[in-house]
Amino acid sequence: MRILQNKTMKEQDNQLKIPEPLRADWFMVLVTIQADLIYNALVVLSSPFFLLYRSYRRAVVTVSAAEKAVKRAPAQIAGGAGRVVRRTWFGILGACHVSMVMVLALILAVVIGVGIVSLYVEKPVVVRDRLFFDYTEENPSAVFSFDKKKRSFSVPVGHSVHVSLVLWMPESEINRRIGVFQLKVELLSLKGETIARSSQPCMLRFRSKPIRLARTFVMSVPLIAGIANEAQTMRIDALKHQEKMPRTKAVRATLIPRAQTRTLPQLYEAEIVINSKPPWIKRMAYNWKWTLCVWTSMYLYVAILTALLWCFRPVLFPYTSSRTISESENLEIEVVEEEQEQVMERRRRERRNQPRRRNFATTQKSYT
């Protein structure tokens, strides 16, 4: 029963429902629909012409780009040639600069290396000088001083000193009768103290009377001509000493007659010979002095070049740094220009490709 009542009530409501009135803007809607139809018809009719115009514009842009590329090619070629010449010139200047720096570094290394080796290596002392014995003394003596020369010198500490005397003695009757005499050699310090002493007997070589006569007969012509003489040369290894503190400043040689006699030998000339021998390490360094100079200079040269490369690279390669900076700036400018051209081209394309057709919904919204 309730269901039937509901149905009857709904039917009565439908019968009593008031119809909706007509819209007030129905005229504007009709006008809008007609305008859209006209616009779409015009777009469809004019689209071939727009397509032709766009293709024409694209052809014009392509031709202009080709013309720009053709015009830019000689400038790029000229710029490339100038760049090649500039780089060649910078390369020559850089090579000259690097060569000059390397030569200066080599000279500096050689000077320092030779100086270091000269400071370490000790040259053996070799001295040969005349001695003059003072026969006014009871025992004639002669002194050789290391400060006598124009340039004073001394024996380095650690060297072995060998002192020798060379006596040129005539074969006179007095020297033959004397026979043996004593030779004393002393090393004196700066204060006059005796550092080392050596004394040994000396005598002429014995020659019998027949030998002397035969020799005189055979050598008569050279003796008369003055080419030969009747004399003997005696070399005496007098003293050997290890140099240490206090330092040696002079060498004194003294002639002492035989015991119970006062006759002294006759001398034509006397010489002193001093030779020093360094320790074996410094002796080896002295023998290989130039090799040490070469190797020390090479090591220093490598060290100087390494220091220049690590700490003073602009001094060694000044043109490279300036060239890299200029090239980087030019590259940045070119990149910026290319980006600007790409942005402008992209904007042009976006403007050309903007849609010129509006849909029906947007038009209806604009009118409403």
Curated annotation (Swiss-Prot):
Expressed in seeds and young seedlings. Not detected in leaves. It is a multi-pass membrane protein. It comes from the Eukaryota. Residues 346-359 have a biased composition (Basic residues). Pfam families: Seipin. GO terms for cellular component: endoplasmic reticulum; endoplasmic reticulum membrane. Keywords: Endoplasmic reticulum, Lipid metabolism, Membrane, Transmembrane, Transmembrane helix. One of its GO terms (biological process) is lipid metabolic process. The chain crosses the membrane at residues 26-46, 101-121, 292-312. Residues 344-368 are annotated as: Disordered. InterPro entries: Seipin (IPR009617). It is found in: Endoplasmic reticulum membrane. Its main location: endoplasmic reticulum. The N-terminal domain (1-98) determines the lipid droplet size. Involved in lipid metabolism and lipid droplet (LD) morphology, number, and size. Facilitates the formation of large-sized LDs and modulates triacylglycerol accumulation. Induces probably a reorganization of the endoplasmic reticulum into LD-forming domains. Belongs to the seipin family. Knockdown mutants have a reduced accumulation of oil per seed and a reduced overall seed size. This is Seipin-1. It comes from Arabidopsis thaliana.
